[in-house]
């Protein structure tokens, strides 16, 4: 049973390594961890750095682990989350690369599969409407697509949850399902109307992306955990859809920012993308 200090619909100020062992009954993990691709991250508030070339992505975490350290961090997190997830739960893991570190995250993914009780079952391409053009290299592409990796517990590859509609019934071997494609188009960052850009986090995904992913993988009244809650985007999407959420975040500034966003989040009764009754 979950530690009673962890209430639904809360964001805990603290490391995911400390919070993950306390979760239970989680249906979906939806997150975008730090990519470990920064070369200029500093433990100072981003808004206090006048020179854009000096700014790190985050106000607290230094995004420059060694390759081995980053792999160990992610393996440790997945292992600590294991008992708190439903057996049919999925982990939706948005992670990518940089020109300077194009393969580092591949080692982390490989170690998660080799060293934890999770395995990879799907990959989703997130197509952004725009991206920053790569004009500084002669042979690297501009990254307008980011991957989202879908993990489940080993042994549940055929039974993990997915909202894929059944279009014909019969014996299990003869059932047919409506196609659900591994390609999602969604805006990037907090660019919705009336939403301010978070000064403490320069690497956010969008509410639109979260809603589309949760409609694919979250059951009704699901409990969604984001170990890297950041500015609160996952929680805002959950509130809009009438889902429950838990989050962990080491930045006090971002926790306060997320809580303010949640106070103004739109009711699920007027949001396209909510679950039908």
State where each predicted segment sits.
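Conserved phosphoryl-transfer catalytic core
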Residues: 50-60, 264-277
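Short, conserved SAM-binding/catalytic segment
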Residues: 1-7, 259-274
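Core catalytic lobe of class I
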Residues: 1-257
